[in-house]
């Protein structure tokens, strides 16, 4: 009998259990970022950081060639059209399947409205302030709309991070509100802040509508429709409301090209992130755009950055750290038997 063999009856001390895996390997196998964490990291690195360059570069193009906001929107939409080739190669319909086509068009329309408001706002208010108002309003609206429409709540740490982002918004925008008493300039400043707020509201609605689209080529379809809808709406408006202006120098052309590429990268990363994490958390992490915009506002546009702006940037970064730390989770691949 195998159980009576001397080999099996030896004391346990002479035959210890096999050595465990190296600690580093076990940690790597046991701890993996959750889907929410992966989405937030993509939103931070691929969505917020590239988007922080868009506002200052748009301002530079406007200052160099007086490039109207509608024309800048047209150039940006042109970068979305080549996605049609990808859809054709995959054999997917350009306008989406019939059951989701109306929602996909509505999502694209909201995206264009959000971009248009952002471009208009950045021409009359500082780039960092415009980005802060837009991202702050999108964060608040996303939290409220998701809670009301999807009944998807947030943890206490998440709410703490959201409130920190809103505090950063108030610190940045608060001093600028005093300019509303300076006649015509104050009126334009107020309109710029209103446009930035409406841009954030449209962004939050777009993210919620996008989350409701469930079909494989969702992201490239919405990206192509955004370019198509933007061109159909902007080209007639450009000739009616503004005079077309071609970029006059290499700097303007470089800014236009960089805006188109960076904006498309940001759009793609945000579209991926919002399917993995709560829309309000994605919008909060996108506040990293504000920090980048403030840095570029000082070094590239040579615009004054107030001490309150620096404090607000620190508050925003701290809030993003809280949200990210809360969503960092370790998924165990196995349990240790006692």
UniProtKB/Swiss-Prot annotation:
This is Solute carrier family 35 member G3. It is found in: Membrane. Keywords: Membrane, Repeat, Transmembrane, Transmembrane helix. Belongs to the SLC35G solute transporter family. Residues 49-174, 272-325 form the EamA domain. It is a multi-pass membrane protein. The gene encoding this protein appears to have arisen by SVA-mediated retrotransposition of the SLC35G6 gene in the primate lineage. The lineage of its organism: Eukaryota, Metazoa, Chordata, Craniata, Vertebrata. Pfam families: EamA. The chain crosses the membrane at residues 37-57, 67-87, 105-125, 160-180, 185-205, 221-241, 250-270, 281-301, 305-325. The keyword Transmembrane applies. The gene is SLC35G3. Expressed in testis. It comes from the Eukaryota. Residues 1-24 are annotated as: Disordered. One of its GO terms (cellular component) is membrane.
């Amino acid at each position: 009998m195998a159980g009576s063999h001397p080999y099996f009856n030896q004391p346990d001390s002479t035959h210890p259990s096999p050595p465990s895996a190296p600690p580093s390997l076990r940690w790597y196998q046991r701890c993996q970022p959750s889907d929410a964490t992966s989405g937030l990291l993509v939103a931070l690195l691929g969505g917020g950081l590239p988007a922080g360059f868009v506002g200052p570069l748009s301002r530079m193009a406007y200052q160099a060639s007086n490039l109207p906001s509608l024309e800048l929107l047209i150039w940006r939409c042109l970068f979305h059209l080549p996605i049609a080739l990808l859809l054709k190669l995959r054999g997917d319909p350009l306008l989406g399947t019939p059951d989701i086509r109306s929602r996909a068009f509505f999502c694209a329309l909201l995206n264009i409205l959000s971009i248009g408001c952002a471009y208009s706002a950045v021409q009359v208010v500082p780039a960092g302030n415009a980005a802060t108002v837009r991202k702050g309003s999108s964060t608040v609206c996303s939290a409220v709309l998701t809670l009301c429409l999807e009944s998807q709540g947030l943890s206490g740490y998440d709410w703490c991070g959201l409130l920190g982002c809103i505090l950063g918004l108030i610190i940045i925008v608060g001093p600028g509100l005093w300019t509303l008493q300076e006649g015509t300039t104050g009126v334009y400043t107020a309109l710029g802040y209103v446009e930035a707020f409406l841009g954030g509201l449209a962004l939050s609605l777009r993210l919620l509508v996008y989350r409701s689209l469930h079909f494989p080529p969702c992201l490239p379809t919405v990206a192509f429709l955004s370019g198509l809808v933007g061109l159909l709406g902007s080209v007639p408006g450009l000739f009616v409301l503004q005079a077309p202006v071609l970029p006059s120098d290499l700097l303007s052309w470089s800014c236009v090209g960089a805006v188109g590429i960076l904006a498309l990268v940001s759009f793609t990363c945000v579209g991926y992130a919002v399917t993995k994490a709560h829309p309000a958390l994605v919008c909060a992490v996108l506040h990293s755009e504000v920090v980048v915009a403030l840095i570029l506002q000082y070094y590239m546009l040579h615009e004054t950055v107030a001490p309150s702006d620096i404090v607000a940037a620190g508050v925003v970064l701290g809030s993003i750290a809280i949200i990210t730390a809360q969503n960092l989770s370790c998924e165990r691949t196995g349990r240790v038997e006692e």
